A protein has these predicted regions:
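Short phosphate-binding loop-to-helix
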Residues: 69-92
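Short, solvent-exposed amphipathic alpha-helical segments in soluble enzyme
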Residues: 28-31, 49, 113-116, 216-218
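Histidine-anchored nucleotide/phosphate-binding helix
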Residues: 28, 39-40, 44, 85, ...
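Anionic-ligand-binding alpha/beta catalytic cores of soluble enzymes and soluble regulatory domains
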Residues: 92-139
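N-terminal beta-strand-loop-alpha-helix module at the start
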Residues: 1-63
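Structural motif
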Residues: 15-19, 99-103, 126, 203-205
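Long, charged alpha-helical interface segments
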Residues: 133-220
């Protein structure tokens, strides 16, 4: 069973062509590292070796293709992210930790989120960890009090919570529309339940020290 908080139980790391964590992140994970096209360039700069480079390979430095194994997928109807996910699925390397999903052009980021919503993977963009909670799902999360958390319905969802500063009671969340951004945990354990739709859950690794810690509580 994979652990969305401690990043354990995942079968691979998929690197997209965005902002990547530092080298120490990769050295502590004993799983295959797969680079989606140009992400291999960033891994090289970090001194991290991918097990495979895949995609249409129009962004990776040619020298790296002489050094590391690669799989060229020419299909222009899918993104490098989707091509890499196809490889992971075929080779039983899911669920995966997805890094590099942010950074770069806004349209790329939005498309990456769109693809991510269809997966059972973990988004890791320090200091944020993210995952999708689907319809009729429940989860208990052990988090430090005052941990910042955002809950976004994509495209629309109904969710309830226990243990947040601004509780949600059958709250309708939608994108575009109203969401629960920059909420905070009140207790060491919180409970989330999605009644309908899918929710993107984004959790900050560090406790956030700001004025929100002393703001009066309110209910949705």
């Amino acid at each position: 069973m994979h652990d969305v908080i401690n990043l354990t139980g995942y079968r691979s790391i998929l690197c997209l062509n965005g902002d990547l964590p530092g080298p120490s992140f990769f050295s502590t994970k004993n799983v295959p590292i797969i680079a989606a096209d140009g992400a291999a360039n960033h891994l090289f700069d970090l001194g991290v070796q991918p097990q495979l480079i895949t995609g249409d390979l129009d962004s990776v430095h040619p020298d790296l293709l002489e050094t590391y194994p690669f799989l060229h997928v020419a299909d222009q109807s899918s993104s490098d992210y989707q091509k890499a996910m196809g490889y992971l699925k075929k080779n039983d390397l899911l669920p995966s930790i997805i890094v590099g999903i942010n950074g770069g052009h806004l349209d790329h980021i939005l498309n990456n989120i769109n693809i991510f919503m269809e997966t059972n993977c973990l988004l890791y963009a320090p200091p944020i960890k993210g995952f999708v909670l689907n319809e009729q799902s429940r989860i208990n999360l052990a988090l430090l009090p005052h941990t910042k958390i955002s809950l976004i319905g994509i495209p629309i969802a109904t969710l309830s919570s226990i243990g947040l500063q601004w509780e949600l009671h059958n709250a309708q969340l939608s994108f575009p529309g109203t969401n629960s951004c920059f909420n905070r945990t009140l207790h060491p354990e919180i409970f989330l339940e999605v009644h309908q739709g899918s929710v993107l859950v984004l959790i900050y690794e560090q406790m956030i020290e700001d004025a929100g810690l002393t703001a009066p509580s309110q209910n949705w």
